[in-house]
């Protein structure tokens, strides 16, 4: 994980910066660059988005987005996958999906990468739950485990 501690930026100033690859996030007034996804991470992400959309998108119930910047509650993060209920998807004047998402997703999914802090990722999920997210998943590919977080409930753990 790369941190750029140069000067303290506001969230508004951070959002004016050009995007980085991999994405950078704004958390607690710090810019933190996400690690580059590796094979297991990419394989899981690549399977989940179409699987979720195959179920929820035809009914216009919800839609899954990979690597979508969500800015809310003083942070700007890029979860691996977010799902928004159809009626909450921001739209532009033409009715197309907007470029800017300034709300917490309904479901956030993070896939742990080898170079990523489980604590940092868990804090991002908890931040989402605090701001209206209904469910958060933390997938640990190496342990073949999914941690499921819901507001005001005990975390559940599912092993493969």
Give the location of each predicted region:
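Gly/Pro/Ser/Thr-rich low-complexity, intrinsically disordered segments predominantly at protein N-termini
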Residues: 1-160
């Amino acid at each position: 994980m790369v941190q750029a501690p140069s000067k303290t930026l506001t969230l508004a100033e951070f959002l004016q910066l050009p995007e980085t690859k991999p994405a950078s996030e704004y958390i607690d007034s710090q810019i933190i660059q996400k690690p580059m996804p590796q094979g297991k991470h990419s394989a899981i992400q690549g399977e989940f988005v179409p699987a979720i959309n195959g179920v929820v998108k035809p009914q216009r119930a919800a839609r899954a987005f990979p690597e979508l910047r969500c800015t809310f509650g003083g942070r700007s993060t890029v979860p691996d996958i977010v799902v928004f209920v159809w009626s909450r998807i921001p739209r532009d004047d033409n009715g197309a999906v907007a470029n800017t998402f300034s709300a917490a997703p309904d479901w956030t999914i993070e896939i742990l990468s080898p170079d990523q802090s489980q604590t940092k990722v868990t804090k991002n999920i908890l931040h989402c739950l605090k701001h209206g997210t209904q469910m958060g998943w933390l997938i640990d590919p190496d342990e073949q485990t999914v941690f499921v977080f819901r507001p005001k409930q005990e975390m559940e753990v599912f092993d493969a």
